[in-house]
Amino acid sequence: MLDNTYMSAGVSATLLSFLFLIHGCLGQAPPVQLTYRATGSSPEVIAVYEAWFGTPKHISVGYTSHDPEVIRNQIRKAKGMGISAFVVDWYGDREPFIDQSYALVQNLAAKNEFKVAMMYEEANVEEGATDEAIADFTMFHDIYLSPDAPGHQAYLTYQGRPLIFVFPNGNHTDWAKVRAVVNKWNPAPLLIQENLPGPHPDAFDGFYPWINPGPLGWAADGSNWGDRYLADFYKNMAEKYSDKLIVGGAWPKLDDHKASWSLNRHISARCGQTYTETLNMWRKFFPAGQTIPFVMIETWNDYEEGSEIEPGIPTCTEPSSKTALNNQVKSSLATTTQR
């Protein structure tokens, strides 16, 4: 069995660029008219960012999320890989350490021509989840989105509206009530929730897929990497929810054995194929001219669940495989240029 290693940032950037040059070349997509489309010819690539390293509740990864130099280096590397924004997991005042990390990321993003967004971790409590969410969103707006907030100009927007992602936990929040509150902001945010519409479809402006093995469930060898899950997500969004903002999903692998909450879940990197195929899956469902606005990499640095891309795109150790991949990218780029 081949071990996983990582390509250099240069190869990563080349591959990422190539992947987004070939839109329209990967099969016939059904006709669809999107309300929210990419502002350019390709989706903007963003990445989920964990800001909890340095606390005793999480494993040591050799750095703390409170080190400005670490964050500057991460931003520089992400930009070199074609990533334009970090989507930071955020828990409101439930996790002060993470809140402080977020402030650092936003400030440094503003100074380094990078973007940042918040992914709200819903409180998993039966009573008070709605009030908690409203209080957290209000806090976030006042501290990070107001005109005098440090680094507010770095916040990720679409057509001038800030994007806020929601990661559901327990589904106890009345999002219609939260929506009514945030609609009073100027500008009102675009709320993006995981998976397809649930009990409050009108409360959300868009949806994103999350790492999932698909209907066959988790395989011991990691061979169920999520192709059917992603296909179902994109098919449903194209056919039923083309009026919503669609954020695509991509993941390199998953192995959560290091996490204290481990469920022994595993998705094989397949020598980098899992990443490249998830990154491109959306193309099969959306034709040229109907490009989705964002693709979100899951994740930049979740080392506990083993979905990190910070070290680079997973590949295989054999030298010939790297040479073959480089040749494949160069050949495909030449073909694309001639089209």
Question: How would you label these PLM feature ranges?
Answer:
Residues 1-16:
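Classical eukaryotic N-terminal signal peptides for Sec-dependent ER targeting/secretion
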Residues 5-6, 19, 39, 70:
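Residues at the start of alpha-helices and the adjacent loop-to-helix junctions
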Residues 6, 20-23, 58, 202:
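Compositionally biased, low-complexity repeat tracts
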Residues 18-31:
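N-terminal signal peptide
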Residues 28-339:
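Glycan-processing catalytic domains of CAZymes
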